[in-house]
């Protein structure tokens, strides 16, 4: 009986040793496939590689590089954010030109207009022009808000689209050109917002005109 048990033990050991030289089956070595949820969690922002990719920034919008460190896109509609970005960017593009032009001596006739860009604010308040500017800006905001509300309700309007299309980019066949122009506008908008902030800061710090270098 003892010899039989020993024989079985030796046979089992030999089988185990032999199995080490046999190639494992596919089923045994098949790696676990990552779930889509794990893949999404692993995705990183293109602009901020140390932060996760915002769920609402999928790259479909022009200039979308996943930059949202504060997380605004998680609780504010992305179309509203793009509308605000384009509006502020367009205003700053005009402001950069107007700010520099004023300090280069281009202004309306009259002594009341012969002031620097920085001094123009106080001059407008003193003459009563500032309330008029506020009134007109408020009127334009009220009118444009109708289109924004309709957009958020699903009208299909693209953010920042007010029907101004002098190059006929909306016509069939111009899709690629339209995408190119949309990207360029966003890039210029962002640059103008930074540039205007820098120009105002430099003008105040150095109390000088263009190019605001002291």
What is the meaning of each model-derived region?
Residues 3-7, 14-16, 21-214:
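Alpha-helical transmembrane segments and their helix-helix packing motifs
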């Amino acid at each position: 009986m003892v010899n039989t048990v020993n024989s079985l033990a030796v046979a089992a050991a030999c089988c185990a040793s032999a199995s080490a030289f046999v190639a494992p089956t596919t089923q045994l070595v098949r790696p676990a496939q990552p779930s889509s949820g794990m893949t999404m969690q692993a995705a990183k922002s293109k602009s901020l590689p140390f932060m996760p990719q915002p769920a609402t920034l999928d790259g479909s919008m022009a200039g979308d590089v996943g930059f949202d460190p504060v997380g605004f896109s998680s609780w504010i509609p992305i179309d509203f954010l793009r509308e605000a970005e384009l509006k502020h960017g367009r205003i700053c593009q005009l402001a950069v030109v107007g700010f520099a032009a004023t300090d280069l001596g281009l202004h309306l006739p009259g002594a009341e207009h012969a002031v620097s860009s920085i001094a123009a604010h106080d001059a407008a308040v003193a003459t009563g022009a500032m309330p008029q500017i506020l009134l007109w800006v408020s009127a334009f905001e009220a009118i444009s808000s109708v289109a924004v509300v309709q957009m958020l309700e699903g009208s299909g309007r693209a953010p920042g689209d007010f029907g101004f299309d002098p190059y006929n980019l909306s016509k069939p066949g111009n899709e690629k050109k339209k995408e190119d122009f949309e990207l360029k506008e966003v890039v210029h908008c962002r640059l103008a917002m930074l540039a205007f902030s820098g120009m105002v800061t430099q003008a105040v710090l150095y109390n000088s005109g263009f190019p605001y270098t002291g």
